[in-house]
Design a protein with these regions (language model features):
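Intrinsically disordered, low-complexity tandem-repeat regions
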Residues: 2, 45-46
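Extreme N-terminal basic, low-complexity initiation segments
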Residues: 1-10
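N-terminal, polar/charged subdomain of small-to-medium soluble alpha/beta proteins
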Residues: 11-39, 46-48, 52-128, 134-136, ...
């Protein structure tokens, strides 16, 4: 990731998570490798220390990895989309992503989670958001992944401008208060449906 982008290793309960907001292309396979590598009950100084310790690879108890990749599509609301632009207040976006990971950890304690979101111009077919969840059981991995994307849409301060044939428009972004219990319950209901 570029030096100006936000990457954060977050310590929560008994495991770690990686969250980030970047203008660089997203790689779900790299994020998945990083999430699998995060070992419970281990304190990492920063992102680089995880990469430098190959002996920290952890996956013996995991039976599932679930991923989600959000892509830029070529249409929306009956219009042909040319490209999207995402903007964010990066420090607050990283904090909101970390909060989502903490919430997921409370609901699914065995899950380790990573979330990255792009900013800047994205062309059709490019990944805008990636989520990786690893867990001993597939149900928890799927549910945590689904919960994470619902909460990203609710609370992360990232704004999207859609450029279409004949114009452009800002689309409504995150509007829920991160502390709003009703919004959390909606996301949890969707994740567990």
């Amino acid at each position: 990731m570029a030096a100006s982008d936000g990457v954060q290793m977050t310590r929560y309960t008994e495991c770690m998570a990686q969250v980030g907001v970047t203008s660089e292309p997203l790689d779900v396979h790299a994020l998945t490798r990083e999430v699998v590598r995060l070992k419970p009950d281990t304190t990492y100084e920063d992102e680089e220390s995880v990469r430098l310790k190959p002996d920290t690879t952890y996956g013996g108890t995991d039976g599932a990895i679930a991923t989600f990749t959000g892509l830029v599509r070529d249409h929306n609301q009956g219009r042909r989309v040319r490209f999207l632009e995402y903007e964010a207040y990066v420090p607050l976006a990283v904090r909101a992503l970390s909060l989502i990971v903490e919430e997921a950890q409370i609901a699914w304690p065995t899950v380790r989670l990573g979330i990255h979101h792009r900013i800047g111009r994205l062309d059709i077919g490019e990944a805008s958001v990636i989520i990786a969840a690893t867990s001993p059981h597939r149900g928890d991995a799927f549910a945590a992944c689904r919960y994470a994307i619902e909460r990203v849409k609710q609370i992360v301060p990232i704004w999207k401008r859609e450029h279409f044939e004949g114009g452009e428009v800002w689309l409504e972004g995150a509007t829920a208060d991160p502390e709003d219990e009703a919004a959390k319950q909606v996301a949890h209901r969707i994740a567990c449906a």
